[in-house]
Amino acid sequence: MASYTVNKAGVTFVRGLIDKKRYVLDSDWGDAQPSADEQNAYLDTHSWKEYAAWHLGLTEGANDETKARYAFVVGDFSRVHRTGLIACVYRASEWRHKEVELAAHKLLQHLDKVSG
């Protein structure tokens, strides 16, 4: 099983989006999360750094500037999705990636506080 560290730059970026009210409170994450084609299209016009910012986890041992490096996406490359954060908490918890789970949980709590 892969091991992950928290993408601190991603956490900061997502928190900033929440503070700017760039979020979706009610969505179907299965439909909203970026497909492989949408990820490729995003990378055609954005840097790897910008792509990485949408992910809360970094895969240990994976090369930088590869899709394999970045895990636990929480937005659609435009807005953070509450359901994306919930999915991240759930997946990280299920696979015992505690630090990623806690980072996602804190962001979810922040989103709930900001959104009232």
Where are each of the predicted segments found?
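A charge-rich, low-complexity, intrinsically flexible signal that marks solvent-exposed coils, linkers
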Residues: 1-116
